[in-house]
Design a protein with these regions (language model features):
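Flexible, gly/pro- and Lys/Arg-enriched active-site loops
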Residues: 43-50, 65-68, 72-168
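Short, surface-exposed acidic-centric catalytic microdomains
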Residues: 20-64
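Catalytic domains of carbohydrate-active enzymes, especially glycoside hydrolases
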Residues: 205-221
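N-terminal capping/lid subdomain adjacent to the active-site entrance of alpha/beta enzymes
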Residues: 163-208
Length: 443
């Protein structure tokens, strides 16, 4: 039987509690899907911490009563202590739907009565919002209304979609585009190779400057992926990036750090050193151990589309419909990650501008972000166009480091069309451009 379960927490490291609960649900059922994550105001007893809320869909052979008891055991094992009705809790698991069954049991082994569908569902925007992420067209067996219709009838303005971080922090995905600053500690990257790899101190100072300029995330890479670049060993990649991550954390830098790698061994070392996100240009395909690692650790991932490698990619830019094909690939890799145990709320997708795409194809991907998002079911979207060759081909600017204005145009269009994050070299200029854009939009 397919069952929808709501998850909520407002104590301690809320996202860790939700991730742990999802894994524990996976021990009593098969987790089929999970929603995005929402930061919400407490609805009934309002004088308490804000909640994080999500919904998952699982498949189970357990009866409704046995499934409820299993959920209550998870709550108890995770340290939930009864306080007062609608009060704070480490974890809360509510059964929303049990297939299309209607269930009403007065008492379940000393617990409150079991009512399915959940009797307060229709008034809870904090439940309907994440439920709509994964089942917008599901029909309530009693009211005959779809979830998206039910959501439209309640106020869910206070449900803020967020991107969780392992340390308990979070990034707001709704208010404005997030800026990821690029820190290449490589000798051969296409626009800044050899600039920041001379010493750990030099790289660390540049990261600090990008943070001061407005970077929300620092993305550290130790291998160039420009067309024609030679691959490096995992050991060399780790030698370049791990000391920088460690030094930033030792310096008290709390900004999220993303490690740009497709090697699980490098990713694991980076996570242990303090990395918050793994940015995998192969979407977990090049190293079969990558997605299981992220399912184990709960560290978020960026899944990017590419074809071939740095040597062969330019020959593989052949598509009938680049937007459809790239978006479908990102959706497919998302579904693979979900099956591996990575929650939807821990995933961002990247169309991979410049990776096996020509200028026309890159421009189409930016121009049709709306269609792209529709195909991926509104997965958070990262756009990484900074200083790339297609910008030079459109603008005539040959020197990559001088493509600031062309990059800015892509950034603004991406923000307008619905991307949540942009990866750039020129953080200060990007921050100023976005400040002006949002200043105008809010007037």
């Amino acid at each position: 039987m397919k069952v929808f379960v709501a998850l909520g927490s407002n104590l301690g490291n809320r996202q860790k509690h939700l991730f742990t609960a999802l894994k524990k649900l996976g021990s009593i059922a098969t987790v089929l899907d999970s929603s995005f994550l929402y930061d919400t105001k407490a609805m009934y007893e309002t004088d308490q911490n804000r909640f994080l809320n999500a919904v998952c869909r699982v498949e189970t052979d357990l009866s409704p009563t046995d499934f409820l008891l299993a959920c209550k055991k998870i709550e108890k094992d995770m340290g939930r202590v009864k306080t007062y009705r609608m009060g704070p809790r480490v974890i809360d698991l509510d059964i929303l739907f049990y297939g299309n069954d209607v269930v009403h049991i007065d008492k379940v082994e000393g617990l409150d009565n079991l009512v399915i569908p959940h009797e307060r569902l229709q008034e809870r925007g904090f439940v309907l919002k994440p439920l709509c992420d994964i089942a917008p067209d599901f029909i309530h067996p009693l009211t005959g209304k779809t979830i998206k219709d039910m959501l439209a009838s309640v106020n869910s303005d206070d449900c803020v979609r967020i991107f969780p971080l392992p340390d308990g922090g979070m990034l707001n995905l709704q208010d404005r585009m997030l800026i990821m600053g690029i820190l290449n500690v490589t000798p051969d990257s296409f626009s800044d190779g050899g600039k920041w790899n001379a010493s750990v101190e030099q790289a660390t100072e540049h990261a600090k400057q990008m943070i001061a300029d407005g970077a929300d995330i620092i993305d550290i890479g130790g291998e160039s992926t420009r067309p024609g670049a030679a691959a490096v060993t995992e050991e060399e990649e780790a030698r370049r990036v791990i000391p920088v991550i460690r030094r930033l954390r030792e310096a008290g830098i709390a900004v999220p750090i993303s490690v740009d790698t497709y090697h699980s061994k490098v990713a694991r070392q980076a996570i242990e050193a303090g990395a918050s996100i793994v940015n995998d240009i192969s979407a977990g395909e090049d190293d079969p151990a990558m997605l299981p690692l992220l399912a184990e650790t709960g560290v978020p991932v960026i899944l990017m589309h590419k074809r071939g490698n740095a040597v062969t990619m330019d020959k593989q830019a052949v598509y009938r419909d680049v937007v459809k094909e790239v978006a479908e690939y990102c959706l497919d890799r998302t579904e693979v990650a979900l099956r591996m145990g990575i929650p939807r709320w821990n995933i961002i997708v990247d169309p991979g501008l410049g990776f096996a795409k020509n200028t026309q194809q890159n421009c189409a991907l930016v121009n049709e972000i709306g269609r792209f998002n529709g195909i991926t079911k509104n997965m958070p979207l990262l756009i990484a166009a900074s200083r790339k060759r297609f910008i030079g081909e459109v603008t005539g600017v040959k020197n990559a480091a001088d493509r600031v204005m062309g990059t800015a145009a892509v950034t603004l269009l991406s923000a307008e069309k619905g991307a949540q994050m942009v990866r750039v070299h020129d953080v200060k200029q990007t921050k100023e451009i976005l400040d002006m854009y949002y200043g105008i939009c809010k007037e």
